[in-house]
From Swiss-Prot:
Keywords: Monooxygenase, Oxidoreductase. Induction: Expression is controlled by the fumagillin biosynthesis cluster regulator fumR. Expression is also under the control of the developmental and secondary metabolism regulator veA. The keyword Nucleotide-binding does not apply. Fumagillin and its derivatives have been intensely studied for their potential use in the treatment of amebiasis, microsporidiosis and rheumatoid arthritis. They have also interesting antiangiogenic properties by the irreversible inhibition of human type 2 methionine aminopeptidase (METAP2). It catalyses: prefumagillin + NADPH + 2 O2 = fumagillin + acetaldehyde + NADP(+) + H2O. InterPro entries: Monooxy_af470. Disruption phenotype: Completely abolishes the production of fumagillin but leads to the accumulation of the intermediate prefumagillin. This is Monooxygenase af470. One of its GO terms (molecular function) is monooxygenase activity. The gene is af470. Coiled coil: none annotated. It holds the Pfam family Monooxy_af470-like. It comes from Aspergillus fumigatus (strain ATCC MYA-4609 / CBS 101355 / FGSC A1100 / Af293). Its EC number is 1.13.1.-. One of its GO terms (biological process) is fumagillin biosynthetic process.
Amino acid sequence: MDQSMKPLLSPTERPRRHLTASVISFFLPNQFRLSTILCIGALLQTILCAVLPLRYAAVPCVTVLLISVLTTIQECFQPNTNSFMADVIRGRTTAQIPGKDGTHGREPGKGSVVVFHLGIQYNHPLGVFAPHMREISNRFLAMQQDILRRKDELGLLAVQNWRGSERDSGNTTLIKYFFKDVESIHKFAHEPLHKETWTYYNQHHPGHVGIFHETFITKDGGYESMYVNCHPILLGRGEVKVNNRKDGTEEWVGTLVSADTPGLKSFKARLGRDD
């Protein structure tokens, strides 16, 4: 039986684009307390009632609510219209780093992975609208866009944004980077955009803005993952630029393979260790 690992996603000519939340939907909801949002809605409805006849003033609110209810009913009874299932891969999958030739081979857990957490906290009543936050956020965004354009050069496997929920304010934003090796993260740390961001931060010393990072380094047999009925996430979003073995053309190969492959069914097996 062929126990070699096969990628679940077809190779692509360019890095795959995944569904992402808009900047507004990612940041804005947590900038206001629920009571504030309700009060804003009540104020807008009051204004409509003051300038329009009652039977017309209720139309916007009722329309939005009706669309939401009907959409939910449709997605529940017609699964093919369920937007929440977009890009979901059914079954058990795991992330394995492909080799330079684009194949995953037979040996799990091969290759090193460096996980780098880079985050920012905005400890201010104005949240992302606080002093210096616009400039710092723009610099973070510029770094993100630059590293995505140069994924192969900088050894980036995957990146994903997260928002912390340890506080009601949701004022912590975390960027999770997955690099191929230590050399890759060193290269990223010495990039001009990274240095310029630190220079700006150190010059202005905004006490209400916190910046943090964490680094985790793994070697062969030091990483393992399991995703069940998930869209590509975390290291499962990883991609490596390789040369096609048949015609030598460049392509991007993903990390996701089936976890039901005989050699990947257990925790130890996915680490490349004997049971």
